[in-house]
């Protein structure tokens, strides 16, 4: 087990006390909001640190009693009974704190941009992309997050060829960041008379929603084109040019949005562009920092097949962690907590293993 960073623990306690004092002093509203946010992040960590320090102190007192030859028999028996319990509690607290004290991903608390694109499989792939979007939409609802569709291209038989949405809420990215990759479905299409199982796929990308301070986009680096927005069957949804296409010249990235309001389109397209550029920079930093990373979960390779949804067998399998659940009907309805939590736990275990190796 990796050693606990004692200096970091003391620094967190000191910072927590400083925030408490500043909040009590009645700062300006905007300052108070920032302090309250940091306070809520630090509170569970500092509580665990204090529980740990208390347990260490209890163990030291019990050991002193046992070492003292003048301790009477009843007290000695009580100390011998309590010490193993306290030592077990210390080990559990150490495990909890190692996870809490792992280096934080700066984007974890952000909202997210969700992009789903139908892959191989034609109409069935578009239907599956629609199923995935509804799965994430329902999962978001259970968390109290807000989902807003930025753009969507519907499939001919339903579902989506492509759909892009924002999911707004605290910590969205931390929960959904491991959903990026190729999702595969195996099922019998409704139009399949012979009952033959078809395999199709959809690609999911989850990007942290970037703010202006995260990415600077210079006006001279973008080209904005307007065109007529069209709905299903190519019908014009309004008589004015409203669809917007923004091209980021240095990277060649192209983002489109086709709501009725041109002003909204530009804002939404810039929102997606900013997040994609931020994600590119994050991917670059991550690959440089952990070229030898062992954790398959954290690789972020969006061409990688990460999960299979097998409808005839009622199972969903995440290939990165070899986890199979036989409750596909509930998973596809948005009950993905077990998958999400298992992926996060696996990633944290990989981080802890690396930390332990670095300390050897």
Curated annotation (Swiss-Prot):
Modification type N5-methylglutamine: residues: 235
Signal peptide, first to last residue: none
Annotated compartments: Cytoplasm
Residue numbers spanned by region Disordered: 284-304
Family matches, as PROSITE patterns: RF_PROK_I
Transmembrane segments: none
Keyword terms of this UniProt record: Cytoplasm, Methylation, Protein biosynthesis
Gene Ontology CC terms: cytoplasm
Recorded GO MF terms: translation release factor activity, codon specific
PTM summary: Methylated by PrmC. Methylation increases the termination efficiency of RF1.
First-listed, main subcellular location of the protein, grouped into a coarse class: cytoplasm
Annotated function: Peptide chain release factor 1 directs the termination of translation in response to the peptide chain termination codons UAG and UAA.
Family: Belongs to the prokaryotic/mitochondrial release factor family.
Record-given protein name: Peptide chain release factor 1
Gene of this entry: prfA
């Amino acid at each position: 087990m990796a050693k606990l960073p004692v200096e970091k623990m003391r620094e967190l306690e000191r910072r927590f006390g400083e925030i408490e004092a500043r909040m009590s002093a009645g700062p300006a509203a905007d300052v108070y909001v920032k302090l309250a946010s940091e306070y809520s992040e630090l509170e569970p960590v500092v509580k665990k640190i204090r529980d740990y320090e208390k347990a260490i102190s209890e163990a030291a007192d019990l050991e002193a009693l046992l070492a003292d030859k003048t301790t009477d028999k009843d007290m000695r028996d009580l100390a011998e009974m309590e010490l193993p319990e306290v030592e077990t509690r210390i080990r559990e607290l150490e495990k909890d704190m190692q996870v809490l004290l792992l280096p934080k991903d700066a984007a974890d608390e952000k909202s997210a941009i969700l992009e789903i694109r139908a892959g191989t499989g034609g109409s069935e792939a578009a239907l599956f992309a629609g199923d995935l979007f509804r799965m994430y939409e329902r999962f978001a609802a259970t968390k109290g997050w807000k989902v807003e569709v930025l753009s969507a291209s519907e499939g001919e038989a339903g579902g989506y060829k492509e759909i892009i949405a924002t999911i707004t809420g605290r910590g969205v990215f931390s929960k959904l960041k491991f959903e990026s990759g190729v999702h595969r479905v195996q099922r019998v299409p409704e139009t399949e008379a012979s009952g033959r199982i078809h395999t199709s796929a959809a690609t999911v990308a989850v990007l942290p929603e970037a703010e202006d301070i995260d990415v600077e986009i210079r006006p001279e680096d973008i080209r904005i084109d307007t065109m007529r927005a069209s709905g299903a069957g190519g019908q014009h949804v309004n008589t004015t040019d409203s669809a917007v296409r923004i091209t980021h010249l240095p990277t060649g990235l192209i983002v489109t949005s086709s709501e009725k309001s041109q002003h909204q389109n530009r804002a939404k397209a810039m929102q997606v562009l900013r997040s994609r550029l931020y994600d590119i920079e994050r991917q670059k930093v991550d690959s440089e920092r952990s070229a030898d990373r062992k954790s398959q979960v954290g690789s972020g390779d969006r061409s990688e097949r990460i999960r299979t949804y097998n409808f005839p067998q009622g199972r969903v399998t995440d290939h990165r962690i070899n986890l199979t659940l036989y409750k596909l009907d509930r998973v596809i309805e948005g009950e993905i907590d077990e998958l999400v939590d298992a992926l996060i736990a696996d990633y944290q275990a990989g981080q802890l293993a690396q930390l332990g190796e670095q300390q050897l």
